[in-house]
């Protein structure tokens, strides 16, 4: 199992806009239905951090995959390219990058999982 994170550093106050993009709340955001139908996709979460001692916020996009190949197939798909503005003519024209300072992508192989023990009463 593979976990991919995209940690997006944004100016204070810009996180809600980024979150709306990934949840589709803008009406033109991340196609959550499309990713949910990708073979090998296991889950998607958004995390939001507001460090009090920093002048920025972070939105961490996490996705869980059966394999590296499954995740790479998503990145190569037309749905991914459309959602991320990677069409021939739109890459530099995207206004929805406002407030984004930078980002870092990391890949992790899951080496251990501990699930809760369910005790029947």
UniProtKB/Swiss-Prot annotation:
The record marks 74 as: Transition state stabilizer. GO terms for molecular function: heme binding; heme oxygenase (decyclizing) activity; iron ion binding. It holds the Pfam family ABM. It comes from the Bacteria. The keyword Electron transport does not apply. It catalyses: heme b + 3 reduced [NADPH--hemoprotein reductase] + 3 O2 = biliverdin IXalpha + CO + Fe(2+) + 3 oxidized [NADPH--hemoprotein reductase] + 3 H2O + H(+). Residues 2-101 form the ABM domain. The keyword Transmembrane does not apply. It is found in: Cytoplasm. Its main location: cytoplasm. One of its GO terms (biological process) is iron import into cell. Residues 78-98 have a biased composition (Basic and acidic residues). It is an enzyme of class 1 (oxidoreductase). Residues 76-98 are annotated as: Disordered. GO terms for cellular component: cytoplasm. Keywords: Cytoplasm, Heme, Iron, Metal-binding, Monooxygenase, Oxidoreductase. Fe cation binds at residue 6. Heme binds at residue 84. Its EC number is 1.14.14.18. Homodimer. Allows bacterial pathogens to use the host heme as an iron source. Catalyzes the oxidative degradation of the heme macrocyclic porphyrin ring to the biliverdin in the presence of a suitable electron donor such as ascorbate or NADPH--cytochrome P450 reductase, with subsequent release of free iron. NCBIfam families: PRK13316.1. PANTHER family: HEME OXYGENASE (STAPHYLOBILIN-PRODUCING) 1, SIGNAL TRANSDUCTION PROTEIN TRAP. Belongs to the antibiotic biosynthesis monooxygenase family. Heme-degrading monooxygenase IsdG subfamily. This is Heme-degrading monooxygenase. It comes from Listeria monocytogenes serovar 1/2a (strain ATCC BAA-679 / EGD-e).
